[in-house]
Amino acid sequence: MMNERVNKVALIGAGFVGSSYAFALINQGITDELVIIDVNREKAMGDVMDLNHGKAFAPHPVKTSYGTYEDCKDADIVCICAGANQKPGETRLELVEKNLAIFKSIVGEVMASGFDGIFLVATNPVDILTYATWTFSGLPKERVIGSGTTLDSARFRYMLSEYFGAAPQNVHAHIIGEHGDTELPVWSHANIGGVPVQQLLEKHAAYKQDELDQIVDDVKNAAYHIIEKKGATYYGVAMSLARITKAILRNENSILTVSTYLDGQYGVNDVFIGVPAVVNRNGIAGVTELELNETEQAQFSRSANVLKDILAPHFAE
């Protein structure tokens, strides 16, 4: 028993997303140990107490505690959910100035602890802040992962499942690019239970392209609609973070549309962006390069360029 590996996750930021992520980790029994770190010590301690009180109902006993940056030293994953929130009407990219300063401090503190694991970034604009985390940390690019378009792809699969009357698990479709306004659907590879969506459109008059275009629009604007109604989005992204965490800790080699570094794939260099990638215990094991059609490739290149334009003033090559 003494030689058994203990999985440890350090969560930085016990706001809506962070506390929902902690709740998901415990309810799914994904990790053995969870330490919660927040500038608001009382909030983090309250979360720990609340979560521990439900431990009898969890599938796996997760040791949950309040901690400091020093506790990151032996963590397998440090998940960063801290940062300024997106306000109504504010785009994810408008958050960049505020959150870059916050991240420089956080990542510096984590690395000073001796941390040598995997960073998982959730804070928006996630593609920019994942790049920042990689730069500030000095870790290999494979060990810095952003939530990317995992949630966007899940939203897409859910909406397509409702439209076509199939379980989301049987809908295979990706949203790639920036987690934001320039993201795009990969229709050329979308299928329902193995049947290409394009084929379903051709064979069934009930299915219409303009209705599918509306689904894409709904996916892109989902966060804005939720923020209008309840002030923030957190359950969906927390579940996507839990899914990525599970893929890492259980060495799954699962393909997820995370924000990862591109070094020539899809004709793009030096940017973190949402694409399908193999995720395992080492972080990113490889990028899955879909063969995009001409329209998709142009849209993806534009998305990457939008991110690079935002990075340029802050990170000189």
From Swiss-Prot:
**So where's the catalytic machinery, residue-wise?**
H179
Q: What is its main location?
A: cytoplasm
**Which is a Gene Ontology cellular component entry for this protein?**
cytoplasm
The EC number(s) this enzyme carries: 1.1.1.27
Record's InterPro entries?
Answer: L-lactate/malate_DH (IPR001557), L-lactate_DH (IPR011304), L-lactate_DH_AS (IPR018177), Lactate/malate_DH_C (IPR022383), Lactate/malate_DH_N (IPR001236), Lactate_DH/Glyco_Ohase_4_C (IPR015955), NAD(P)-bd_dom_sf (IPR036291)
The pathway this protein participates in, as annotated, is: Fermentation; pyruvate fermentation to lactate; (S)-lactate from pyruvate: step 1/1
Residues given in the record as substrate binding sites: Q86, R92, N124, P125, V126, D127, D152, S153, A154, R155, T233
- Supply one GO BP term: glycolytic process
Q: Which SUPFAM superfamilies match?
A: LDH C-terminal domain-like, NAD(P)-binding Rossmann-fold domains
Q: Which UniProt keywords apply?
A: Allosteric enzyme, Cytoplasm, NAD, Oxidoreductase, Phosphoprotein
Q: Which GO terms describe its molecular function?
A: L-lactate dehydrogenase activity
| Binding residue positions for beta-D-fructose 1,6-bisphosphate | R157, H172
Gene3D superfamilies from the xrefs?
Lactate dehydrogenase/glycoside hydrolase, family 4, C-terminal, NAD(P)-binding Rossmann-like Domain
Query: Where is it located?
Result: Cytoplasm
Keyword 4Fe-4S: yes or no? no
Residues binding NAD(+): V17, D38, K43, Y69, G83, A84, S105, A122, T123, N124, S147
Catalyzed chemical reaction(s): (S)-lactate + NAD(+) = pyruvate + NADH + H(+)
Q: Which Pfam families match?
A: Ldh_1_C, Ldh_1_N
Q: Which residues carry this modification: Phosphotyrosine?
A: Y224
Family as reported in the entry's similarity comment: Belongs to the LDH/MDH superfamily. LDH family.
What the protein does comes down to:
Catalyzes the conversion of lactate to pyruvate.
How does it associate, per the subunit comment? Homotetramer.
How is this protein named in the record? L-lactate dehydrogenase
Species of origin: Bacillus velezensis (strain DSM 23117 / BGSC 10A6 / LMG 26770 / FZB42) (Bacillus amyloliquefaciens subsp. plantarum)
Organism lineage string: Bacteria, Bacillati, Bacillota, Bacilli, Bacillales
